[in-house]
């Protein structure tokens, strides 16, 4: 069985405005960090790389809701020291249009930074540029 060639496309987190930090402004309802978009290049999965900055003078807990809110299945709980910047996710995958959300033990003091590497199928006719009903193929990648 042959598998289609895949490529990585680096993307801004969907919860970020132009790559800026995402402020975790909630202690109960998850703030969107990233949502996997299976329609983007028939994306197989996204690999996330996330850092957190705690601007408070006290240690804070960051909880990442990874595709759901069931404990412990979908929760990643991290303690972040006061005034520290810490890598909190190093290449964990998400797929199937699931999302990653965050809550913190105090609102408006923890910021999330990062990016997603989307693993996508390369279009077989990568040398041509053409349009279809739903997608435009450019240099082998579907652009929306």
Briefly describe each language-model feature range.
Residues 1-43, 104-144:
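C-terminal interaction-tip segments
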Residues 40-49, 93-95:
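Short, solvent-exposed loop/turn segments enriched in Ser/Thr/Gly
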